[in-house]
Amino acid sequence: MNIIRRTVSRQDDWDSSLASLPEPHILQSWVWGEVKSKYGWNAERWIWEENGRATAAAQILERRWPAGLPWPSSRVLYVPRGPILDWSNSALASAVLSDLTSLARERKAIFLKIDPELSLSISEGTDSQPEPSAVGASVEEALRRSSWIPSLEQVQFRSTLRLGLESDEDELLARMKPKTRYNIRLAERKGVSVRSGSESDFDDLYAMYGETSIRDGFVIRPRAYYLDAWGAPLRAGRAKIFLAEVEGRAAAALILFHFGPTAWYFYGMSRSAHRESMPTHLLQWEAIRWAKAAGLRTYDFWGAPDRADPDDPMFGVYRFKAGFGRRGRGVK
């Protein structure tokens, strides 16, 4: 196997190479590296090729350790939702991981963190138990043998719910939980409407996100961060905004990122008012319909508890997302 690695400096080269790989991720896209570059990270992009064809990619984010902590001149390296490659190709995986390890040593990094979208277990259907993934288990064992250490610090969600979009709309509806279908129809009867959004809606989106964070007990970043995190992908054609309105006012919204064959439900927000009209159910369905019409193959609900445990703080989120008929749950 003659694998050549090169550094990429052009957006079109990077995104087209990335899109040709299995399961490319939005967090490995050029625009996401540009977003992070505004917040202390430097993005370096590597492509591995064999016979002139891209076989792997890694967008490596690097930053210096924050001042005032023990190693002020040292660096940390992070490959969000990467590297991207066919993990069943053990020789390729070994070459990619070896190159990344060498980079960390050359830069004298405190650590190098990777979190590839590698399924360790998958469940089919809304109520089935996860089944182990042979490839995931093999890669996990190989990483342990190579002195990689499982991190206790979660950056991205370990688990997610996915919906295949190959079926027609009637079949997608039929696969939903009956209560979810009912709530979609209820929202329509209650006069909820869904429209596309733009940057002119950002102030309203951030206000709703703040209201959601207080109600659900999570912390959000300053407004300026979201102007970049939402605006850059939107301008690059990698994001779509949906707003559900009741009586002419936004009651809920979501921001969908998309790259390659996949859409990700990255951000959701809602007001406490009009929740009885079920705007979030119709909103989600319209986003799914758009993703299908756009030719995407997978809708990723982006985030779920590792186990469907009613005592888990995220169980309510899981139940809402699972109601749309997801077909698999992978633990990364």
Model-derived segments and their meaning:
Residues 91-108:
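Short secondary-structure subsegments characteristic of cysteine-rich extracellular domains
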Residues 80-88, 129, 275:
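The substrate-binding groove and active-site-proximal loops of carbohydrate-active enzymes
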Residues 130-153, 314-330:
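Conserved acetyl-CoA-binding loop of GNAT-fold acetyltransferases
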Residues 70-83:
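N-terminal cap/recognition module
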Residues 2-69, 116-134, 143-276:
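A conserved beta-strand-loop-helix scaffold within acyl/acetyltransferase catalytic domains
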